[in-house]
Amino acid sequence: MQTVRFDANDAPVIGYLHDDHDRLVAHKTRPAIVVCAGGAYRWLSPREKDPVALRFAALGYQTFLIDYSVEEKAGALRPLRELAACVRILRERAEEWHIEPEHIAVLGFSAGGHLTASLGVLWNHPALKLGSACRPDALVLCYPVITAGEFAHR
């Protein structure tokens, strides 16, 4: 297992990459997943980071954890810009990191689920200016906070 680190619009990202691509017979690439921990946009829950990422790595994914902005730094679509940039970077470096560029998923818990769902529907928002390169191919929403009004989470 190889570890890579990079920044996505200043958000630290760590990736867990399989380094056995030379031994793969059929495909030399793997699907990728970006994990977004929850924490009410106040913090990032440790139990929704490495344990989840390592489980997906065990299932054969190239796995990435993004420490998106929280607290006062989370305004003005900043976490969304960071996650969008992360997906774009995975596509740009797909060959180098042996990623299937058409199989990039984003998974999020709670506030991270909100962020994940937001990218799923707002990937083409003019403020992102990244086009389809930041569109995830799949979303995994784990108890996301996405309901407002009368039925909102309290």
For every predicted segment, state its role.
Residues A85-R154:
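Primarily recognizes the serine-hydrolase "nucleophile elbow" in alpha/beta-hydrolase
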Residues P46-F64:
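Short amphipathic alpha-helix adjacent to the substrate-entry channel of hydrolases
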Residues T29-G38:
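Short beta-strand element of the alpha/beta-hydrolase
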Residues G39, Q62, D67-E71, V145:
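Short beta-to-alpha linker loops that shape the active-site pocket of alpha/beta-hydrolase fold enzymes
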